[in-house]
Amino acid sequence: MSTTTLTRREQRAKAQHFIDTLEGTAFPNSKRIYVTGSQHDIRVPMREIQLSPTLISGTKDHPQYEENEAIPVYDTSGPYGDPNIAINIQQGLAKLRQPWIEARADVETLSNRSSAYTRERLTDEGLNALRFTGLLTPKRAKAGHCVTQLHYARNGIVTPEMAFIAIRENMGRERIRSEVLRHQHPGENFGARLPENITPEFVRDEVAAGRAIIPANINHPESEPMIIGRNFLVKVNANIGNSAVTSSIEEEVEKLVWATRWGADTVMDLSTGRYIHETREWILRNSPVPIGTVPIYQALEKVNGIAEDLTWEAFRDTLLEQAEQGVDYFTIHAGVLLRYVPMTAKRLTGIVSRGGSIMAKWCLSHHKENFLFEHFREICEICAAYDVSLSLGDGLRPGSIQDANDDAQFAELHTLGELTKIAWEYDVQVMIEGPGHVPMQMIRRNMTEELEHCHEAPFYTLGPLTTDIAPGYDHFTSGIGAAMIGWFGCAMLCYVTPKEHLGLPNKEDVKQGLITYKIAAHAADLAKGHPGAQIRDNAMSKARFEFRWEDQFNLALDPFTARAWHDETLPHESGKVAHFCSMCGPKFCSMKISQEVRDYAAAQTIEVGMANMSESFRAKGGEIYLKREEA
C-alpha cells in the first residue's frame, strides 16, 4: 500500500497528465485481434496472449521446441487496448454502433433537448471550460416505434449487437486446437442453459425471454455490445463517481479508462458532487462499456439535497437528461414501498442503500407511496424511447450480516418481480439488484428467490459480503460471496474496493476491486462449466509446469504484479528461465522433481525405475527430506 499522499491539486494534475498522454496500450506480450462476423461487417475486439514454445528435446546447442498456441481472452478495454488507434479524450471514441442504429430507421434526431435542466446547462457560459466539446445531437424513437433490444428480439430480429455478442461470448475458443488446453471439468450449473457454442440466435432467444439484457442506449453509440445474463459469462461492474468532498472530471475519466483496462464490463457513474452533468458527458463520450447511473442522486442535488422536496417532475426531467446523454441503464428504487419501511425498524443497521434511504425518507415525510412506484409506467415509456435498461434497485438490502434475508429484503424483491412484468409490457430490458451482507450459508436462497419471483431476469449483486469484520479488506470478504452467487446463477457482480465503508476509491483501489471480482467471476464460470472457461487455467498450469516464467506473468490477470513479486527475490534475467522459484529453491521444487521422475520413467521400464528409486530411498535412510549435500 502506497503511503504517498498527494494534494488535491497534485491529484488533478496527475489525472490530467494521464489523459493528455493516453495511448492505446496492449498488455505484455499480448496483441489486439479482431474476430470478424459473417454479417453486418462486425469486428469483435479480443486480446491474444502470445506464448513462448516448450522445450521438448535436443541438446543445449540444438534444442527442439514445440509451439504453444496463443490464448484469446475477452477484452473490455475498447480502443484503449489497441496500440494502433489514436486516442483523443477531447474528441471521444469512434461511434461504433451509429450505422447500426441509423440503419434500423426507427429513430429521429431531436431539434432540442427534452430536459429543461440540460437546456439550462448548455446556455450557461460559465460552464464552457468544463463542457465536452463534441456533444452529440440526441436521438429518440420515432412515434409509434420501440427501439429496445428486447423489442427486436421478441420480433425475431437478430441485431448486429446480438451477432457481435455471440462472437464475443465464445472468446475465440474455436481457435484452440490443443486437447490439453480444451480439457474442462464438468460444472454444476444449477439449471442454467450453457450451450457449447453461442450463436446470434441463442443471444436473441435469451434476450426475448428476459433472461438476459443488452444495455445499449441509442445515444451511446461508442459502446461495444455486451450481454448480462445467467447463461453467459459472469460480468463485473465497477463504480466510479465524484462526491461533494473529492474528485474531479479528469480523475473520473482516468478511473473510467483504468476500469475498462482492468476488466470492467460496465461502469456506474455514482457522482453526487458538482458538475454531475458535465462529468457524465465526458465519461459517456469516452466509454467503450455501458454506463449506469442512479438518477435519484442527481435529482436530489437539484433540490439542494432535501429528500422531502423531491418531485416526480424533477425526477422525470433527470431521466430525460440522462437518457439523451446516453446512459445505458438506470438504477430505480421503485420497490421501496411505504408499508415496507417499518419492517426495517428492528434491523441492526437499518436502511443502508443511499437510494433506498432517500425514498424511505420521502415516503415517511409525505406519508405517500413511493413516487417511483406510482409513476413506474411513465418511467418505462421513457426507457423504451431510448433503450435504457432498468436495474431495479434493492433499496432495502441488508447492510449487516445480522440483517440478511429478512422480511423487508424479500418483500422488496417480490415487488421488483411485479415491476419486472410491467417493464416487459413496454419491451424494456430489466435486471434485478441484490445484496449486500449475507453469510455464506444464506447466499443461495437469494438466488433461488430471485429466479422464482423475478421470472429469471438477470441478477446483479453487490458482493455479497460474507463477514463484517474486515474494513480495508472488504474486496476479499465480498469476493467470496460474489464467487458463490455467481456460481449459483448471478449474472453480474458489482465490485467492492478496499475502501468500502471507509472512503471514495482512488485509481489503485479500482484496480484492486476489479482484479478481485474478475477472479470471483472466473471462478464462477469454471464452477458452472461455462464452455471454454478453463482454457486460460490450463495454459497457465502448462506454463507453470514447464517453468515458462514469462508466459506465467503474461497469462495472469495482473501481469505487472506477478512479475514484480517474482522479481523481488529473483530479479535477474536468469531467474526467468530457472526451473525453480524462491519459494522452494532448486532442490525442493515439486514440479522439477515431477519432471525428473517423468523423464526417468520414460527412459526405463516403470518396474525397473520404481525398484531403483525404492533402493535409493532406503539407502538414504528412508527420509522424505534430506540435507542439501545428501540430496
Swiss-Prot record:
UniProt keyword list: 4Fe-4S, Iron, Iron-sulfur, Lyase, Metal-binding, S-adenosyl-L-methionine, Thiamine biosynthesis, Zinc
EC number: 4.1.99.17
Entry keyword annotation includes Nuclease: no
Pathway it works in: Cofactor biosynthesis; thiamine diphosphate biosynthesis
Molecular function in Gene Ontology: 4 iron, 4 sulfur cluster binding; carbon-carbon lyase activity; zinc ion binding
GO terms classed as biological process: thiamine biosynthetic process; thiamine diphosphate biosynthetic process
Origin superkingdom: Bacteria
Cofactor(s) named in the record: [4Fe-4S] cluster
Binding site for [4Fe-4S] cluster: 581, 584, 589
Residue ranges of the TM segments: none
Name of the top EC class for this enzyme: lyase
Listed GO CC annotations: cytosol
Chemical reaction(s) catalysed: 5-amino-1-(5-phospho-beta-D-ribosyl)imidazole + S-adenosyl-L-methionine = 4-amino-2-methyl-5-(phosphooxymethyl)pyrimidine + CO + 5'-deoxyadenosine + formate + L-methionine + 3 H(+)
Binding site for Zn(2+): 437, 501
Entry-linked Pfam families: ThiC-associated, ThiC_Rad_SAM
Binding of substrate, residues: 239, 268, 297, 333, 353-355, 394-397, 433, 460
Cofactor note: Binds 1 [4Fe-4S] cluster per subunit. The cluster is coordinated with 3 cysteines and an exchangeable S-adenosyl-L-methionine.
Job description of the protein: Catalyzes the synthesis of the hydroxymethylpyrimidine phosphate (HMP-P) moiety of thiamine from aminoimidazole ribotide (AIR) in a radical S-adenosyl-L-methionine (SAM)-dependent reaction.
Assigned protein family: Belongs to the ThiC family.
Subunit structure: Homodimer.
Protein name, UniProt field: Phosphomethylpyrimidine synthase
Organism: Salmonella arizonae (strain ATCC BAA-731 / CDC346-86 / RSK2980)
Organism phylogeny: Bacteria, Pseudomonadati, Pseudomonadota, Gammaproteobacteria, Enterobacterales
